């Protein structure tokens, strides 16, 4: 691909240009409150297909459709279940994707052969302004090469997407740092497919019932299994280095790193730990603070690439609350290499 890529401020002129490109069936990278995304008109199958080419994304990985509010759902979904209405009232606009029965107007390319579609209502003013200016619901995955860490600023988008799409809107750093929570309301019970800033506990409170948790959140998806949500693929969010997640105390972590000094490893650790380890380190947030970890995890994984690291040992976060989202991204970055110390 050899497309001239322009980076523009996310001001009125930039938003107008983005809207024009979307209406023409082109791609635009833009900020959301979670991570930067690559947008295409969700009703234009040819435009949506360009996302898969730009990212090198497998065709069996469905896309999320972004709208400003429930009034845009006509034709995109065939029904809005009661559970979806409860979740939209509680969390939208915001970092939540709700899987609903697919409608006739959404491009088949968005859905990977499924009879469902993920719908999100972003709260970021730039994303909302582009939807309103273009009149398009847009399909948008994260704006990175497939399998790499998601970008949280325009420079990281440019690193991956230069020459692959015509426009990147620079809206500064993203607020949350990990992708949206994905929950399905199709079937007998609601099911969490991807953790994010809206936690399992948040969902259960809003719905007043237990939410099932997909095994794919914390385990490798079996070969040939149907991918029902973005973020379920085997290896994802990964830097170039071989990452191994070490689950234990700091003392156990340090002892393991010291014992493997011959590998010349680097470490992905919590705030304040780097100076105690004696090897190159990147810190990804305060221990026990899921929000801080989520805000920095993808930028930290990209920093490992910038250092040229080959072997990385990573501190393991908690596996509940908001930290579940961080753990979910890290085990995929590590291709499920986890050592219990």
Specify the residue positions occupied by each region the protein language model found.
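Active-site-adjacent structural elements in enzyme catalytic cores
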Residues: 1-341
């Amino acid at each position: 691909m050899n497309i001239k890529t322009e980076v523009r401020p996310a001001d009125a002129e930039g938003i107008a240009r983005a809207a024009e490109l979307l209406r023409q069936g082109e791609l635009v990278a833009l900020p959301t409150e979670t991570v930067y995304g690559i947008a295409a008109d969700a009703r234009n199958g040819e435009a949506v297909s360009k996302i898969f080419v730009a990212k090198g994304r497998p065709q069996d990985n469905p896309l999320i459709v972004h709208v400003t509010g429930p009034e845009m759902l006509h034709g995109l979904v065939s029904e809005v279940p009661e559970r979806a209405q409860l979740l939209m009232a509680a969390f939208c606009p915001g970092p939540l994707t709700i899987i609903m029965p697919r409608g006739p107007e959404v491009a088949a390319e968005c859905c990977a052969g499924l009879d469902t579609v993920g719908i999100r209502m972003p709260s970021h003013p730039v994303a909302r302004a582009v939807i309103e200016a273009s009149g398009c619901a847009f399909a948008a995955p994260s704006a990175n090469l497939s399998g790499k860490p998601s970008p949280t600023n325009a420079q990281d988008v440019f690193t991956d997407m230069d020459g692959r799409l015509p426009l990147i809107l620079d809206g500064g750093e993203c607020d949350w740092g990990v992708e949206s929570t994905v929950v399905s309301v199709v079937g007998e019970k609601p099911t969490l497919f991807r953790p994010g800033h809206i936690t399992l506990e948040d969902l259960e409170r809003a719905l007043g019932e237990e939410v099932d948790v997909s095994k794919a959140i914390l385990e490798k998806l079996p070969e040939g299994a149907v991918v029902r949500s973005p973020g379920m693929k085997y290896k994802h969010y990964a830097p170039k280095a071989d990452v191994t997640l070490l689950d234990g105390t700091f003392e156990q972590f340090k002892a393991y790193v010291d014992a493997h000094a011959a590998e010349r490893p680097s470490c992905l650790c919590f705030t304040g730990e780097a100076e105690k380890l004696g090897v190159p380190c990147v810190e990804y947030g305060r221990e026990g603070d899921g929000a801080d970890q989520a805000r920095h995890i993808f930028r930290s994984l990209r920093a490992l690439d910038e250092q040229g690291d080959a072997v990385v040992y990573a501190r393991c976060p908690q596996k509940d609350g908001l930290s579940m989202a961080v753990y979910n991204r890290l085990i995929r970055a590590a291709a499920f290499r986890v050592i219990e110390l």
